[in-house]
Amino acid sequence: VYTGVDKTVKRAVPLKVIRRIRDLDLTLSPVLDYARDLFMFSFYTRGMAFVDMAYLKKKDLQNGVLVYRRQKTGQQLFIKWEKPMQEIVDKYDTSGTPYLLPIIRDMDTDARKQYKNAAHLVNDKLKKIGRQLGLAIPLTSYVARHAWASIAKSKNIPISVISEGMGHDSEATTRIYLAS
């Protein structure tokens, strides 16, 4: 039965497109700049899911290593902290919150609601960036995750390593990413 949704929608973009996204001058549109920054942060952190970025805490970063648990699987991941990640974090004021990124900003409002609203806003703005760049697929936060996996595979990184890096429960899940 065809549900109207194709199982594997092409979501990955090549490294040259990632570079175009990174290098786009968005100084005149802070909201597009913010969306791009979160997209790039995801890419730099092995395609970290938006929900995981939202709940990253400042205390998760210690001695040059970011340690967090995937919301979806509970798997603990370790990521070496790199300069481009720090540059994004430094751009935004998150004082008054325990969070590393400016996604959950108001400590008196439901965190899940804020994350959902931010995800919607960011994906809406990423689609706009994608249209600006003339991309054939809608640009969303998910594209960063798929792109990281595909680019890693193109660099001959073993699927087992890509799978572990993405916090997948099985290599079968990673293979679905790499097929799309």
Outline where the language-model segments fall.
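Phosphate-coordinating loops and pocket residues in cytosolic domains that bind phosphorylated ligands
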Residues: D23, Y55, A179
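Catalytic-site neighborhood detector that most strongly recognizes the C-terminal catalytic loop/helix
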Residues: G4, R70-G74, M166-S180
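Short, contiguous acidic/charged loop-to-helix segments that flank catalytic cores in large enzymes
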Residues: L26-P30, V67-F78, T109-A118, A136-V143
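Short, basic (Lys/Arg/His-rich) helix/loop patches that form interaction surfaces
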Residues: D23-P30, N123-E164
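C-terminal catalytic core of tyrosine-transesterase DNA break-rejoin enzymes
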Residues: M40, Y44, M48-D52, R145-D169, ...
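Long, amphipathic, Lys/Arg-enriched alpha-helical "connector/arm" segment
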Residues: Y2-D33
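Conserved tyrosine-mediated DNA breakage-rejoining catalytic core shared by Y-recombinases
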Residues: V1, T45, Y55-K91
